[in-house]
């Protein structure tokens, strides 16, 4: 800070004079141009006094020192680009920062007094002087830059030329428009703050530190130019119009007065037009006033000063007309403007082409700049280059076929590509664009920083090897692109999440991590690669911890190792790197000075004690107890675990499937890991690495999404963990534990052979689709669900089918079903038949017993298939069914015991053998309405046997209308139990005393409809008998071959519909007899048909063969005879009476005769009456099964259909030279002469016989027959029927005949 520009009132001069910043207080303020000149004159008279009164003052009355430091170092909440930032103050209230994206302070040098403006240039204040340590040697990150020249301008603005391109930042490349008036500046650079647009600027510096707390100032004079102590704030610009910018450093509560040592640091404003931060100026001095107010003065950005220096060190090389530009002995030739004056200058190439080194070229502080989107080739045998570095601007590509000097580091910037094709034997520092490693061990070491650079492998062993493979990811990192090559690391030297390992090639890469001790990788992994960590044996303390992120569709594989995925403890600024030390003996330790860190901590000890947040002042980049953690997202295909441990820690979001064998999985692990060097892991000049891992307990929210397949393993899901098993869960000999506070949701089903212990929450649902409708999911537990805590919750809803017993001794909660569920929530991609079979029409089905006498259960729209004695404290049942049934291991009757039962609109279905039954026992309270009792009807009681079987008991005075009897359909009967209510001194009971049974008309009708499928198939074959060959009249050939295909659909009542496709081929021979032509032949057929109705569906495949004869009389009469056998393979699924799916075979015989006579009305028009009679045989079938324990059977015997048909066809022919087409139409009446077969149904109530019925229908058809030449005929006919119980809706018949 300029020491001579503070103002004090002088009794001698009667006005303000300039004195040192370190002098006493100011009593007035200066105005007027003459007064400024007078001040400057007095400045150089040496009116200086020494004091700390106006050193840096961070106001920590309600803010922490760390807040100001985080601010300047882009740490904590102050990340570059962040918005809506709120600082939590010591009193718990918040301060919201101005409404603007937070600036990136990376252009600010480590010591704060200089700012990079891109390339090899920086700005500062002139009064700092060239020889000042913070100007002569400037540092960003782990790199040191030497000033080689500078240019200055009035009043105090300086721009420096450095010896290297700065790789750590792109720099603050633009300045504010200083020609604007204050009002114009407000419009362009103003931001909203506390509801008002204000001209606010942001700053960072590391001047002499003091803190102000409740008006008291505590100095730390020894602290200045320390990179760790870089601090900042935002200020209000009070004056823009003069040659200085004046800022009010105390206009708001978050105030931090610029100090000695801040001189030259930049003032940033937000350009609302360009949507970026620009530099308004550099610190010149401070005005301090008697009233305690403070203004900082900034020299305005001077573009001309910058451009003059850049022009001095730039040399443009236009290669558009040159074949080769040659550099030899420091001289550039071949470009049309040969020169020797290029030393220390940036050679700025345009036009593309070749650059040839004919000797080694040391360009001092000058670099090579490639300025357009062209390709350049730099060649030169074994000659070397040395200079400021390589800048590939504007997407240019440079093929680098020379070597860089091995005693220097190559600096690479620019968004283009540097394609390195020779081993360099030196180090690379890159911060922008792409570097391609095209040679073995291309560089000794690579330092990548700023987050804008990529290094891509393009050769085997392109990295140098060693512990870190010679690549070091410094602040904000960059990308290593494996480019299809495999790469292994012992450790990846990465300091933050800016480090990225990826593979952009379509060829998969394998990234192997082989750490031999605990190690944290702070970066990210993504792209087309697999991640492997395989060890021969399992050892402790070599855990791999990922706290950055993973994003790949490929797999991760672990063997004999430990892996943790967790979030990252947010990094914060520290006062000092390391502890205070003094090597002097005790009597002389005062010479080492005080421990300023302890002093700073002491100033905030009271706030830390009150708020319990020691992490605010503990001088550590992070702490396990801090509340702010960054969430890491880890997305992969499948994680394969073999004898390994995998944990998901706090603030991790893991997305992927897991396959585990002999492994341990922990989701929500309370053990967390931090690195006390995070953000500062890269050491020295950028080619060293350190870590200090601290392990301890720290809890935060954990997310897991995916599926798990595990064998001989353990799974533990802990407090604050949320697991969404969106894919299937398969647990073989694997115990799963859900601890208190864990929340687990499964969607795609689960199978487990071991107990699942639940202290937290387990929700089982169906699988949702994009419309939030659900496919049913099955949850099968061969062991039990153990509810081990009072807070345990077991939930099933949204089309979940759950199997497994439930056990608990705790006051746990069981919640099955969903209030709003109905079949409309079923996903459109789900078979309704499947859903009905799994869920029984309910939202949830549960099969198992519940032994939880202290637990409470709620069942809404739930089908509980109770398979064993069960006990609950309370049960609330709504729109549900409790269905007592047996299991493979328990055939006994069961008792459900409940202390309190509230039941409404529910059913209780029980079994009985007419002497014993299932029971419902309510101990303390029973309430509800509209509930029904159903009792299985397994056998019919004899008239002399009087039933009196207790089904339900409840405390006396219970309303006897809670339950009522209801009929149920079992088999083919409607069965209504007779329920009698009795009340005694201590209880009320509902008992079974008899049954009423009647035939269920719908069930019998459904059975008859199913068995009628064979008749309809017979009828379709009948309709095919006489449609074989087309029109046989006037055929000249002696023999023929033919083929036909017929496809049709039909329908009947009860929702019946069928469709069929019939294919038939045949051959025949013509016999010319006296007065007639006789055709005899052989045919084979194949038919695919399917049929469905409201309660069944299925398909039939049929094959058949037959013989036929057709006589065509010269008089116009004809007779057609056919005999045929057909075999049918059937598969039908029925949903009535529990029939299920049946596979069975049947067969049928056909004998048909048709006669007709064709009368010619004219030579080419005719009318043809017809009559047909078909007699056949259809084989019978029989099914036997159980429905709800009742034995059922249904059968039909062989029967013989007899079907007649009469009708008339009319037609007209059209002919040409060698063709003839006949159009025809027909109308007929088809009728059954004999009823089709009888169906016999039997259940526990007796036998029911369903007589076959006759049917008839009207047939209608239109068609065309065509003759081409004498031997080719084909036809097409359309047909349908009406007025029948069964009708052909549409049928099309196509035939083709070839005669020879």
Curated annotation (Swiss-Prot):
Q: Provide the GO MF annotations for this entry.
A: serine-type endopeptidase activity
What are the residue positions of the site described as Cleavage? 1023-1024
Q: Which residues form the active site?
A: 127, 156, 263
Outline the inducing conditions.
Expression is optimal at 37 degrees Celsius, and inhibited at 20 degrees Celsius. It is dependent on both temperature and pH.
Q: Which Pfam family name is an example for this entry?
A: Peptidase_S6
Q: Which residues form the signal peptide?
A: 1-55
Cite the entry's keywords alphabetically: Cell outer membrane, Hydrolase, Membrane, Periplasm, Plasmid, Protease, Secreted, Serine protease, Signal, Transmembrane, Transmembrane beta strand, Virulence, Zymogen
For this protein, the record's InterPro entries field holds: Autotransporte_beta, Autotransporte_beta_dom_sf, Autotransporter_pectin_lyase_C, OM_autotransptr_brl_dom, Pectin_lyase_fold/virulence, Peptidase_S6, Peptidase_S6_dom
Which ranges form a coiled coil? none
Query: The Autotransporter domain covers which part of the protein?
Result: 1034-1300
User: How this protein is processed and modified after translation, per its record?
Assistant: Cleaved to release the mature protein from the outer membrane.
* E.C. number: 3.4.21.-
Gene3D superfamilies per the UniProt record, alphabetical: 2.160.20.20, 2.40.10.120, Autotransporter beta-domain
A Gene Ontology biological process annotation? proteolysis
Activity regulation (record text): Inhibition of cytotoxic activity by phenylmethylsulfonyl fluoride.
Superkingdom field: Bacteria
Q: Give the CC-aspect GO terms.
A: cell outer membrane; cell surface; extracellular region; periplasmic space
Q: Per its database record, what is this protein's job?
A: Serine protease capable of cleaving pepsin A and human coagulation factor V, which may contribute to the mucosal hemorrhage observed in hemorrhagic colitis.
For domains, the record's comment is:
The signal peptide, cleaved at the inner membrane, guides the autotransporter protein to the periplasmic space. Then, insertion of the C-terminal translocator domain in the outer membrane forms a hydrophilic pore for the translocation of the passenger domain to the bacterial cell surface, with subsequent cleavage.
What is the official name of this protein in its record?
Answer: Serine protease EspP
